[in-house]
Amino acid sequence: MAYSYTEKKRIRKDFSKLPDVMDVPYLLAIQLDSYREFLQAGATKDQFRDVGLHAAFKSVFPIISYSGNAALEYVGYRLGEPAFDVKECVLRGVTYAVPLRVKVRLIIFDKESSNKAIKDIKEQEVYMGEIPLMTENGTFVINGTERVIVSQLHRSPGVFFDHDRGKTHSSGKLLYSARIIPYRGSWLDFEFDPKDCVFVRIDRRRKLPASVLLRALGYTTEQVLDAFYTTNVFHVRGENLSLELVPQRLRGEIAVLDILDDKGKVIVEQGRRITARHINQLEKAGIKELEVPLDYVLGRTTAKVIVHPATGEIIAECNTELNTEILAKIAKAQVVRIETLYTNDIDCGPFVSDTLKIDSTSNQLEALVEIYRMMRPGEPPTKDAAETLFNNLFFSPERYDLSAVGRMKFNRRIGRTEIEGSGVLCKEDIVAVLKTLVDIRNGKGIVDDIDHLGNRRVRCVGEMAENQFRVGLVRVERAVKERLSMAESEGLMPQDLINAKPVAAAVKEFFGSSQLSQFMGQNNPLSEITHKRRVSALGPGGLTRERAGFEVRDVHPTHYGRVCPIETPEGPNIGLINSLAAYARTNQYGFLESPYRVVKEGLVTEEIVFLSAIEEADHVIAQASAAMNDKQELIDELVAVRHLNEFTVKAPADVTLMDVSPKQVVSVAASLIPFLEHDDANRALMGSNMQRQAVPTLRADKPLVGTGMERNVARDSGVCVVARRGGVIDSVDASRIVVRVADDEVETGEAGVDIYNLTKYTRSNQNTCINQRPLVSKGDRVQRSDIMADGPSTDMGELALGQNMRIAFMAWNGFNFEDSICLSERVVQEDRFTTIHIQELTCVARDTKLGPEEITADIPNVGEAALNKLDEAGIVYVGAEVGAGDILVGKVTPKGETQLTPEEKLLRAIFGEKASDVKDTSLRVPTGTKGTVIDVQVFTRDGVERDARALSIEKSQLDEIRKDLNEEFRIVEGATFERLRSALVGRVAEGGAGLKKGQEITNEVLDGLEHGQWFKLRMAEDALNEQLEKAQAYIVDRRRLLDDKFEDKKRKLQQGDDLAPGVLKIVKVYLAIRRRIQPGDKMAGRHGNKGVVSVIMPVEDMPHDANGTPVDIVLNPLGVPSRMNVGQILETHLGLAAKGLGEKINRMLEEQRKVAELRKFLNEIYNEIGGRQESLEDLTDNEILDLAKNLRNGVPMATPVFDGAKESEIKAMLKLADMPESGQMQLFDGRTGNKFERAVTVGYMYMLKLNHLVDDKMHARSTGSYSLVTQQPLGGKAQFGGQRFGEMEVWALEAYCAAYTLQEMLTVKSDDVNGRTKMYKNIVDGDHRMEPGMPESFNVLIKEIRSLGIDIDLETE
């Protein structure tokens, strides 16, 4: 296999047995593809597809005026260019967006002409606000902060059938219901009541009999009965009736008379129940009619109106129950034919017929009025109003839309074959739903499972943005309709009609404050990627935490390969927020799909198909680990498979599909946990969640035991610098990489140079530090998409969230009680867990009523020492070390005139006015913070003079830009002259540039000429002269292009900043804070094994092995068995082997062994102990040496989830590393030198430092803010609150009879206002007495009792 630039420098030993059938797809595709589809940025007018913005415009336009004499049509739209790039937007605190311009056409018709002749057409581009752009990493920059729009998992539109699980009625009877859910519009519910009548609700309002809806649709009673029932036909023959016999319908009935065949043989005796055997005999005998007595039809329901044959008088309406009175009339009138409904109790209930009987309406108008009354109670119904309301509910495209998904799901569910159709409902749709519901009630169908992923779909960014945009457009539409009538008379242009504010506001509201637009988690690359791949069931149109039951949160069989069963938050959101599985993607309808390999008759093919949960249901799917031979045939007699959402076994011939990879079940975060298969699911959940909270350490360290997914995450997260095109590194320093692009990758007209500016010490959303470090050296060759620089938490292009620590599992002096962690001082000395946090502090100078605030170093009443870190503009120097309370930006605010004392008046008279009319409002370093200033940014309003600091910052930025452009020009120019040199050398000159005619051109001749002189050469061949001219034109052109670029950037830098109203100047100071690990910090492994650092011991006191190597961390062995996360033990063993092998390689390098020996040893590691084979023979000797140097600290291993290292392989590795195969060794106590009594498990585990640092949590208070009502101190660090002495603590003091302490706690230390002020004064004076008074909360209690109307007073003795 071919290795990339970084891969061959450090190859991971991979233990996977299964071949890579398919690479893990690009992890951010779900975000980028969705938004790309929404914008359709590069499309021309003809290429626009009917999705996204284009679809939103088409659904609202054309807008036609109320009179119908003017129309506004939509032609197309185009997106402009963003004003600033992403970095500038973050810095300036603005939104990264592009202007949207829409071309619309105003058509005015001639009122006089009868056939709407067009009088006038005006076309114009209208500005419709700004549309935020997605960055290449799938985020949005909104007001300067990076945000992510989380995808939503919601109930798919369509029709769903369900029952109440017997909870509604006390009898426990199942009440069935159907619900038609559109994408937008009113919901329509049908439901049975306990008496088996069908009711309908619109938008969950009052229920009406379902027949009311059918009547409103224009159906008569007879048509309804025809649609739902078959009929029994009786012919009247004197005293008896003759029934047209359908034998199947007699099943289960009791024979009223003997039933005979043609020959008079009795088939069924009178009084016997008719069975399936009897029915077969009847069919054989071919009996078509059956004689029954007249009272056989008593109690049956008529299917058609029964009319007197002579007079035309109605004897019985349809849907009437026949009784003796009606039968007598029938006999008297000599009616020939009676039709009754065929119903029974088993599979054909009389539900619709019963519903019609309780329905009070009798025609369409009454039904419409009834629906109008239900929807608009209290309004007087008119015929037109009722008709309009009903039509708008389900039959108008403006108000109702099933969407393509909804129509597809609807048609499939009611058994239609076509999947396309109208977005609105029709009569047949509603009848079909009712029929299906009645069939289910009759036992001929099953209800739906709403948690099935075939019934839930994912709404991505693009779709949600489109919906919001449409909402804005609908608001615009109303206003435009009003104005269109004026357009006819006043000759307005389209621009005068459209006010884009509502659209811009809707879009801004969605991106700025929607529940699904979230502040991006940016602790480390994994937390970014996971946030973008998150799927939430919450949000607008979704569930709410309180209402979501257990079923919705639970893992469903259809989650397999689509949604991760492990990664979800603990707490109230469990199961409502999920993560996409590693290989999952969405299809055109928004359903999640998972990839499978096609299996044909036991032979596994290379073909891969993506299937949704509905499509996979009928397939028999084998696991990725199913045993195969070399011919790719399944060899087991019975294969473990999934079929119909159940796990079972089948023969290989029945298998139709096979998983592509064992890790397709889990999400990215879970697939980073080695030996996941040995961990309990609850702990794995914690492990995947805690990896997202790891803070990037000072020097990233790759995990010795990984899973092979680390490289994918680092590459796709966008924190590394990836080569856009292949080429040679021209120059590299800490802040930029310049690549001279390979000729075959340069397209005509493009520059053959790529410049990558690295991000240095920038603040992330979580205040951690983003810093990129180059991996390449000058002259290195890189291919496209090679990793050239590491970002935060990445090491040589691999995700590196923590550090490999030497750990021992042993109880040690109680320091690791209850999951505490005992650390060695060496960890602190080597800065293994030192992290850098960057804090942004902002100082704003505003215009106040009394005059403008001023940023200055001239601050009243502040000594010289406090100002020594400020420059003349009053802003702190970059590089200054500052502590709590230091001034960062000097600022003075004018203060109002106060009454002056005589002394102050005297001082003012002597020393002038200035000092007293301003007060000091400088920006100071907050308490508990100490750090280094690493950057200062100054933003000045247009028209306000810029200070020296702002100008110097601007100059340095311009220098950077100029340097980049010069570098680019140098390389382009160099490459052009190289090409010319190779073309000219050895050719003959005609003259020019001081050469004689016929002189041959050599390298020396060219070196003697200045570059400008080359273009004066005249060559004998015309083609060469033409090439010289072209080269000269190209270089002039590039120079001009780069100068334009520079001027553009300069203009941007020099224009004033767009600041909020009333703000004159903003100064942002960035502090870098170094945090070493200390007791109280939270640490964790990757298996959910978390703990708090309890103590940091000197190295010499730590347990050490026989060689004297001390361990770094001591963990409690009791934390393992009960939690069942054995993965950590296996990781520790394999980590020990990895480290041991690294030490062996290190010794070989130090002893300067031959490369062949190194090769042999590396071959043993990579190719002789299980797992994937590595092609080391492809590497040159130098590359082998490079590889060995990078393996000195340990050979990194990959043990992919569900396909990792076996116990035997771990033992073989330990043996190869000359380590004990048990993974245990004898340790000695560092303090006494004594052996511990038994061997201890020692090895290397990957430990993370989590973003729960004691520095951020701990604070102290003496006095501070108090609650307004109770006068008790507030709680929490943010409010600078105190410790709550709660109910239980009071009990404790009561138990000890500590009356005075209790009194102090409840009065002066809490809410006795006078007492505490007095106490404070006393302490200041050195007097420690206290005088407790009345606690304020007691007064509150008295007031509350009075509010109940009880007068209460405290009587003093």
From Swiss-Prot:
PANTHER family: DNA-DIRECTED RNA POLYMERASE I SUBUNIT 2. Keywords: DNA-directed RNA polymerase, Nucleotidyltransferase, Transcription, Transferase. Its EC number is 2.7.7.6. This is DNA-directed RNA polymerase subunit beta. Signal peptide: none annotated. It catalyses: RNA(n) + a ribonucleoside 5'-triphosphate = RNA(n+1) + diphosphate. The keyword Transferase applies. Transmembrane segments: none annotated. The keyword Nucleus does not apply. GO terms for biological process: DNA-templated transcription. GO terms for cellular component: DNA-directed RNA polymerase complex. It comes from Pseudomonas syringae pv. syringae (strain B728a). DNA-dependent RNA polymerase catalyzes the transcription of DNA into RNA using the four ribonucleoside triphosphates as substrates. InterPro entries: DNA-dir_RNA_pol_bsu_ext_1_sf (IPR042107), DNA-dir_RNA_pol_bsu_external_1 (IPR019462), DNA-dir_RNA_pol_su2 (IPR015712), DNA-dir_RNAP_su2_dom (IPR007120), DNA-dir_RNAP_su2_hyb_sf (IPR037033), RNA_pol_bsu_bac (IPR010243), RNA_pol_bsu_CS (IPR007121), RNA_pol_bsu_protrusion (IPR007644). The RNAP catalytic core consists of 2 alpha, 1 beta, 1 beta' and 1 omega subunit. When a sigma factor is associated with the core the holoenzyme is formed, which can initiate transcription. GO terms for molecular function: DNA binding; DNA-directed RNA polymerase activity; ribonucleoside binding. Belongs to the RNA polymerase beta chain family.
